[in-house]
């Protein structure tokens, strides 16, 4: 899909680098070492995949590994602007492991099963990205990637955060449409959000789950420039109140039958339950959520 999407991109002006570390085991027929690729075009205009760097087996969710891959990309392929896509499994905004009696595998994106299972926490991502130029966008092509907590933690690293507050369909982003949107000169965050959502909208029947992916997808785009104001207004509302979250819509149904999940609750509904006047909060939220 990425190579198909690259057909609509001027490869003489833009670089698309893809780091792949799949889940196949070393020794299996499908196994490949972690590899950084560049998608470009040959002299005939055909999209080709060239190897930038093949690594030895490594834990790709190790912050040092992510740091090295990004440093290589920035050094060897400098550009006027940058975007980042993080794709794998994802579990929201609370760190793994959670240092409480109720353990929860959350606040991470990325899963590496080399020698066990390890995850990359959002706080680690923020620390790594702070060393590099600010991104135009960060797209989480992973479940539960779009929460206000995640976006707030990354607000100094990127202009826009794009992702889903729910689980996403198995195929993930439709890169045939998303890749061209990534190289839009203006309003890139919203363009990516539309390019992710609209292909699923065309398939939507309301039936879920379905291997034809007719259950739809939830996607939003957050403008990080508006998050400090949203945080300020939110603090003014929640500082004086407590509420049973059992009354609030929970996007993660797993938390209802497993103590290993804490749930992801609808923020707008929460604020409406905490205050009879959410005019200021709604205005701040509408400014932050641009799609």
Walk through the language-model features, giving the residues of each.
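Divalent cation-coordinating acidic motifs and surrounding scaffolds
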Residues: 1-85, 90, 94-126, 247-291
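Terminal, contiguous helix-loop blocks that mediate binding/assembly
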Residues: 99-291
């Amino acid at each position: 899909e990425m190579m198909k999407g690259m057909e609509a991109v001027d490869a003489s002006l833009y670089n698309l680098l893809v780091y792949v570390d799949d889940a196949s085991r070393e020794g299996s027929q499908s196994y490949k070492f972690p590899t950084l690729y560049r998608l470009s075009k040959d002299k005939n205009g055909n999209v080709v995949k060239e190897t930038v760097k093949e690594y030895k087996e490594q834990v790709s969710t190790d912050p040092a590994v992510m740091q090295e891959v990004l440093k290589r990309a920035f050094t060897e392929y400098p550009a006027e602007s940058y975007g980042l896509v993080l794709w794998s499994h994802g579990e929201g905004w609370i760190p793994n492991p959670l240092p409480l009696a109720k353990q929860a595998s959350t606040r991470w994106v990325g899963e590496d099963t080399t020698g066990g299972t390890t995850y990359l926490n959002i706080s680690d991502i923020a620390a790594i990205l702070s060393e590099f130029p600010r991104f135009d966008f960060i797209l989480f092509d992973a479940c539960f990637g779009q929460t206000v907590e995640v976006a707030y933690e990354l607000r100094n690293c990127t202009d826009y955060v794009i992702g889903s507050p729910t689980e996403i369909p198995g195929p993930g982003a439709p890169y045939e449409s998303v890749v061209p949107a990534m190289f839009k000169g203006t309003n890139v965050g919203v363009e990516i959000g539309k390019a992710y959502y609209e292909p699923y909208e065309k398939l939507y029947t309301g039936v879920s789950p379905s291997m034809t992916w007719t259950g739809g997808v939830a996607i939003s785009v957050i403008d990080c420039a508006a998050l400090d104001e949203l945080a300020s207004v939110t603090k003014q509302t929640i500082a004086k109140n407590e509420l049973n979250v059992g009354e609030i819509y929970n996007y993660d149904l797993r938390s209802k039958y497993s103590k290993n999940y804490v749930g992801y609750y609808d923020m707008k509904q929460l604020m409406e339950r905490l205050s009879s006047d959410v005019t200021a909060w709604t205005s701040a939220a509408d400014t932050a959520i641009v799609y």
